Amino acid sequence: MDVNPTLLFLKVPAQNAISTTFPYTGDPPYSHGTGTGYTMDTVNRTHQYSEKGKWTTNTETGEPQLNPIDGPLPEDNEQSGYAQQDCVLEAMAFLEESHPGIFENSCLETMEVVQQTRVDRLTQGRQTYDWTLNRNQPAATALANTIEVFRSNGLTANESGRLIDFLKDVMESMDKEEMEITTHFQRKRRVRDNMTKKMVTQRTIGKKKQRVNKRSYLIRALTLNTMTKDAERGKLKRRAIATPGMQIRGFVYFVETLARSICEKLEQSGLPVGGNEKKAKLANVVRKMMTNSQDTELSFTITGDNTKWNENQNPRMFLAMMTYITKNQPEWFRNILSIAPIMFSNKMARLGKGYMFESKRMKLRTQIPAEMLASIDLKYFNESTRKKIEKIRPLLRDGTASLSPGMMMGMFNMLSTVLGVSILNLGQKKYTKTTYWWDGLQSSDDFALIVNAPNHEGIQAGVDRFYRTCKLVGINMSKKKSYINRTGTFEFTSFFYRYGFVANFSMELPSFGVSGINESADMSIGVTVIKNNMINNDLGPATAQMALQLFIKDYRYTYRCHRGHTQIQTRRSFELKKLWEQTRSKAGLFVSDGGPNLYNIRNLHIPEVCLKWELMDEDYQGRLCNPLNPFVSHKEIESVNNAVVMPAHGPAKSMEYDAVATTHSWIPKRNRSILNTSQRGILEDGQMYQKCCNLFEKFFPSSSYRRPVGISSMVEAMVSRARIDARIDFEAGRIKKEEFSEIMKICSTIEELRRQK
């Protein structure tokens, strides 16, 4: 069925149609090549915004650093990072005055979290800069490598698995005169193949020990690796994002925990909540301003945009905020929270892979690694690149650039929100002491400002005062990109408010369609997305029904599984026809086996296998759900799985869907080509870690435990658990005496092996 899209708009109010103007269909743009240029842009811009600050040299690393704090008062209309420390502290004090006890209580909550968090918190997250290998790794591997190096250097606090103990190790590691690390390298040699008698190149992976002096180690520990941010819509230029290493991550986590706890208590904060809860919070603030503006006052709203939020923030500012927020707390707690901002004010940015050069004439391609940029002759570069390199040279060392000011994307979202809210908080009449007043919403760098005043001059004065107050703490509201409207119509974090929030449906468009995991998961995710959008995004019944039909069409096209009696000829349709002819109850066939679609908008919550179970032929049931069927090679599947869906905007969201194991929930095999590269050793470490954890989960099926990290403790825990379980099973008569004694023997053998090792 082909659909005429204009039908969608017959009864749609104009403001709801805004979503169709968004650039959110089709594939988002991805970056190719290196991010070196983008990173240099970031470093140069950040220094430019703070250029009137003071230059100093870091005594430990010898790196040049720029400190703009308490620099010249900024001019109107120029973006700058010259935050005034006393202004920031005063904003914090007023925030505390308006919310008595807020910092105290948040500190207590955070202290509890600090005591309880295990080091495996750090295994969450994707790519992490691995300082031992000087490149990105999955978080779990990077953590395991760091702990392994710490242990071989005599640091053992982390055996117990508490994050705070791991952080003690990090602090101690920075005092060591040198660290010994293990790096992977590969050797190539030519050998004669016995079978073919040809010469072949054989690669072997070696591990070698390397000593790093204090200064080099500090530089590595303070390094953020950079990558290009992918899939950003609506932008012409790409930009760089940072991945910090394991030394920084734990400290950042605790700072953000404290800031999150504060944000939860602030009505103007758009973080950490999301979705419908966020909309309710925002609607409250708007309601408050509109009721108060009665008939005597005007109320206007600015849909705000800040210029280069991250590059004008300053870690030294965050240090001042932390010092104030934790002012009456125990010393150890204050120290732990001050380390992240201190590390950030001494950070180094890795420039990435470097530049690719091509000579069309000589058919040559060569890569200039970032390490060479400090010394290479600039005549090879075009003018814009030449300027970039000249500017960054004084800051370069071994392919990293010293970057003291600025925050890099996405590191302190919660804490910077607290700073933004503290300025919104100053808009109360008791602080403005005049006829205008303001309030608003802040979510990381995005804000909406609502100003009330008796007349237009008052509104203008209020906006000016807000603008200048922001300047004092290093927030630069962009006059070009912010616009003002009568209160009742504005946009905030891509929510459009028009006397209530309008569903911006186009944001969800990219998540409709076939995910490409496997036949079973794709069907389940597809219908769940439609169901969720009916609940949350005003997807009406008629449109949902149409979305469902389009999804089924897309699904059949993807898996080449048109109905069994179709005329479409593909390699697969031949088999599906045979299946169709020999099936008695054709309604019971999965859509992916050429069956009919039985979904409609009333039964989207039921997995397909349950929906059709009663209609299936018995032998079909047996094939689909028989654990002995060699094709059912799936993991033990819980009743709920998580899919990653990409909304058009913001981070990928995790969405739960029902997972029922059948022959169709296969797992594709991984590409094994990695085995011939130097990554092989790393991959094996990662798999070993995974295997240990899986084994451990078999022993402790309750969901209450947290993964331990010290391998020694894992083995001991499993052995003692095995002994207890065996005794209980033996006494209850579930296992025979021989089995019981065999288990005991195995346990003793394991312990014996550990002792010998």
Curated annotation (Swiss-Prot):
Motif (Nuclear localization signal) on chain: 187-195, 203-216
Could you tell me one molecular function GO term of this UniProt entry? RNA binding
Please provide, in alphabetical order, the Gene Ontology terms of the cellular component aspect for this entry. Answer: host cell cytoplasm; host cell nucleus
Annotated compartments = Host nucleus; Host cytoplasm
A Pfam family this chain is assigned to: Flu_PB1
Renumbered to this chain, region (Disordered) spans 50-79
Q: Where is this region: Promoter-binding site?
A: 249-256
Function noted in UniProt: RNA-dependent RNA polymerase which is responsible for replication and transcription of virus RNA segments. The transcription of viral mRNAs occurs by a unique mechanism called cap-snatching. 5' methylated caps of cellular mRNAs are cleaved after 10-13 nucleotides by PA. In turn, these short capped RNAs are used as primers by PB1 for transcription of viral mRNAs. During virus replication, PB1 initiates RNA synthesis and copy vRNA into complementary RNA (cRNA) which in turn serves as a template for the production of more vRNAs.
The UniProt similarity line reads: Belongs to the influenza viruses polymerase PB1 family.
Query: Know the name of this protein?
Result: RNA-directed RNA polymerase catalytic subunit
Q: Which organism is it from?
A: Influenza A virus (strain A/Dunedin/4/1973 H3N2)
Q: Which gene encodes it?
A: PB1
